[in-house]
Amino acid sequence: MNTVIDRLQPLTIDDLNKVDAATLDILGNTGMCFESKEARKIFKTNGFKVEGKNVFFTETQIRTAHESVSKKWTLMARDPDRTIEMNMDRYSIGMGGGSPFMVNADRTYHAATRKDYINSLKIAQSLDAIETWRVLVIPNDLPAENANMYMMFNQIMHFNKVYALTDETSIDFLKITYGLTEKEMQVQASEGIVYGQITINPITPLVLDKTMCDRAILMAKAGIAMNIAPMPVAGTTAPVTLPSALILQNCEILATLVLTQLITPGCPVAYGTMASNADMRTMGCVYGSPESRILEYAGAQLARFYNMLSRGDVGLTDSMTSDF
């Protein structure tokens, strides 16, 4: 018995088939809520059952969309030497993301600023192991309506590896940077050539809100690679048992995946593993727990089961202090 491999694969083949069967049952009988009229129109035009905001999926519809997802793609970088091949036989290391605070050397902390954001870009640029960007810190000293444009502009100024988009305005920056039209980017994505990536976050349980719906549609039209990463929390937004939370995550990923493939067949999609559990004393979300890692391993197994690339997070902790 390979102890290391077994620990990284908590599910048996029988378990994987059970998760898949439960997913098909939920998406077929409960469906998923899509809060965008445009998204529901796309589903209805393609023969999906739509009732109110809920869309229902047959096994054939899910399998057809899944089969069209690209199994490998090239993530283009502004520096051609930084371009990377994404496939089932390699892994890529990128930045963490979404931190609102910066910790100082004296262990105090402050709200992240524009300077912190640019410094984090420079650090990522200098590290050869880092291949892709993700917004490490969000500058709080900018109006919210300007933050995404500022972040994308400075990403292009200070980073020549693979870009991470922050919102819809990022597409315009990519078109200018690479001298391409949106249609050209879409066609190239179908051929496995991609100019950026973004994360799409469904809301547990079983909702893709209007912002994320519209974002997924626009990104698919532009051929942007998407990490579909819901964040079910066992015990609060998801059932308390780990298998149930895993099934819910699987439903949300596959249903969102279908939408992307209806728009651009072959559009690159990665299986995001972000499920976690709740601290039942405080009801807060716990991301550094053993349960979170088990769910992450199981999610990666499901991705391989569906022959999809996956994305996960490492180095997470719920410690109240740092040890530097």
Short names for language-model regions:
Residues 112-324:
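Helix-rich catalytic cores of soluble enzyme domains
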